């Protein structure tokens, strides 16, 4: 499988034979499994304080008082400690001892990454994620892109390559999150846009970090979650020419 190489002005400058990884079978089931495992392994154990709701001297009055036999505070009739009482303990709360991580076979994980990489070269799968682009896929750029250190320079490249519309899609798609996540540091939901993969960070990481929805990663740290956000493969990806060599050696 061949692909065109473009420079940072968006002009074609040659062709490259892509690694065999781009011919991998599309396996959405494995990709989903790998992404969910990665997300699960980031979770922290959580649970209430061991004595939450039980820090009280409440005792039951016992039978013979014409009221239920729930524990009651010493200075009154109000129930305490039990789950149905105000301020009482939770019934069946989450426990820190629960194992939240998930295991995945190493061969499955690698095959999922290979499959997600191959999906970035299929226009129908990329378009199904909602990405906006013009031109052929995959997008391979000469190694000079790795030395771009200014966001304005990266913006000019994305406009020349016909990818800027996707960045604007991500910018305009930023919405206030539904639910309590709003007050837990996750107020906005940000759509994912372009993924830039390079062999080394010679400045491109700094240039890309302030563009909405754009992510940067070196080829040696590429994973299934970056290639398939939300378990959906086909992320619009820009590959630097040297990164393909690293990818071929790694996978």
Curated annotation (Swiss-Prot):
Gene Ontology terms for molecular function: rRNA binding; structural constituent of ribosome
Q: Kindly list the biological process annotations in GO that this record carries.
A: translation
SUPFAM superfamilies (alphabetical): Ribosomal protein L4
Q: Which UniProt keywords apply?
A: Ribonucleoprotein, Ribosomal protein, RNA-binding, rRNA-binding
Query: Could you say which residues form the signal peptide?
Result: none
Which cellular components does GO assign to this protein?
ribonucleoprotein complex; ribosome
Q: Which domain of life is it from?
A: Archaea
Q: Which InterPro entries match?
A: Ribosomal_uL4, Ribosomal_uL4_dom_sf, Ribosomal_uL4_euk/arc_CS, Ribosomal_uL4_euk/arch, Ribosomall_uL4-arc
Would the keyword Metal-binding be found if you checked this record's keyword annotation?
Answer: no
What biological function has been recorded for the protein in this entry?
A: One of the primary rRNA binding proteins, this protein initially binds near the 5'-end of the 23S rRNA. It is important during the early stages of 50S assembly. It makes multiple contacts with different domains of the 23S rRNA in the assembled 50S subunit and ribosome. Forms part of the polypeptide exit tunnel.
Say which family it is in: Belongs to the universal ribosomal protein uL4 family.
How the protein assembles, per its UniProt entry?
Answer: Part of the 50S ribosomal subunit.
Q: What is this protein called?
A: Large ribosomal subunit protein uL4
User: What is the native source organism of this protein?
Assistant: Methanothrix thermoacetophila (strain DSM 6194 / JCM 14653 / NBRC 101360 / PT)
């Amino acid at each position: 499988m061949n692909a065109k190489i473009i420079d940072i002005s968006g002009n074609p400058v040659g062709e490259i034979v892509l690694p065999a990884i781009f011919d991998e079978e599309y396996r959405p089931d494995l990709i989903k499994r790998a992404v969910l495992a990665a997300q699960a392994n980031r979770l922290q154990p959580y649970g209430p304080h061991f004595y939450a709701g039980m820090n009280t001297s409440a005792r039951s009055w016992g039978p013979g008082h014409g009221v239920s036999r729930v524990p009651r505070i010493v200075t009154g009739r109000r129930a305490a400690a039990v789950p149905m009482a105000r301020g009482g303990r939770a019934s069946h709360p989450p426990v820190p001892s629960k194992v939240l991580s998930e295991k995945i076979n190493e061969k499955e994980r690698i095959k999922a990454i290979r499959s997600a990489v191959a999906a970035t070269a299929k226009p129908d799968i990329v378009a199904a994620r909602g990405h906006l682009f013009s031109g052929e896929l995959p997008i391979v750029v000469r190694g000079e892109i790795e030395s771009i250190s200014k966001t304005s320079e990266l913006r000019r490249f994305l406009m020349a390559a016909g990818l800027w519309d996707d960045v604007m899609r991500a910018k305009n798609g930023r919405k206030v999150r539904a639910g309590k996540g709003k007050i837990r540091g996750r107020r906005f939901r940000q759509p994912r846009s372009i993924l830039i993969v390079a062999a080394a960070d010679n400045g491109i990481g700094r240039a890309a970090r302030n563009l909405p929805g754009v992510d940067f990663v070196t080829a040696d740290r590429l994973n299934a979650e970056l290639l398939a956000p939300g378990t959906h493969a086909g992320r619009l990806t820009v590959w630097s020419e040297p990164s393909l060599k690293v990818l071929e050696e790694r996978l």
